[in-house]
Amino acid sequence: MTTAFYPGSFDPITNGHLDVLVQALNVAAKVIVAIGVHPGKAPLFSFDERADLIRAALEETLPERAADISVVSFDNLVVDAAREHGARLLVRGLRDGTDLDYEMQMAGMNRQMAPDIQTLFLPAGTASRPITATLVRQIAAMGGDVSAFVPGAVHQALQAKRK
């Protein structure tokens, strides 16, 4: 049984993240969605809020696979966190060539530190390719409609943050 580790900030989770997650579930029996916690960063949503939004998004979009997905936090190296959770596969989504260049560097460094852990690159679908959590936050903060880019629970949470 393959366990995949899908790290990210997920601030907030977007339809692009869900696209990659669905693909990951096609190759792994279990996927661990790992929220990176960085003490120096001030995310829009707290860890608990992000975890709740991920769970709500899964119930909304992938209820039949929710049992195959867990949500954890980590504040150490991705490869160390993956090992701690028994995962030997890192999942990374790619939107464009810029993502590929960056992710190839990261995969190379991770491979040096942890040769037992492989990185799996999954291309974003056409509809989710332009979506980034940063753009979603910016558009929502200016009162724009982000409902096409995020699950319903996230859209509601972003609206509540704006009030």
Swiss-Prot record:
Group of enzyme by EC:
transferase
Q: What is its main location?
A: cytoplasm
Annotated Gene Ontology cellular component terms: cytoplasm
Q: Where are its TM segments located?
A: none
Q: Identify the species of origin.
A: Rhizobium meliloti (strain 1021)
* Pathway this chain belongs to: Cofactor biosynthesis; coenzyme A biosynthesis; CoA from (R)-pantothenate: step 4/5
Classification via SUPFAM superfamilies: Nucleotidylyl transferase
Q: Which family does it belong to?
A: Belongs to the bacterial CoaD family.
Name the GO terms of the biological process aspect.
Answer: coenzyme A biosynthetic process
Pfam families in the record: CTP_transf_like
Q: Where is this site: Transition state stabilizer?
A: 17
Role description: Reversibly transfers an adenylyl group from ATP to 4'-phosphopantetheine, yielding dephospho-CoA (dPCoA) and pyrophosphate.
Catalysed transformations (reactions): (R)-4'-phosphopantetheine + ATP + H(+) = 3'-dephospho-CoA + diphosphate
The protein's required cofactors:
Mg(2+)
**Superkingdom of source:** Bacteria
**Chain residues that bind substrate:** 9, 41, 78, 92
Q: Which CDD domains match?
A: PPAT
Subcellular localization is given as:
Cytoplasm
Q: What protein name applies here?
A: Phosphopantetheine adenylyltransferase
Give the keywords, sorted.
ATP-binding, Coenzyme A biosynthesis, Cytoplasm, Magnesium, Nucleotide-binding, Nucleotidyltransferase, Transferase
Q: Which GO terms describe its molecular function?
A: ATP binding; pantetheine-phosphate adenylyltransferase activity
Xref: InterPro entries:
Cyt_trans-like (IPR004821), PPAT (IPR001980), Rossmann-like_a/b/a_fold (IPR014729)
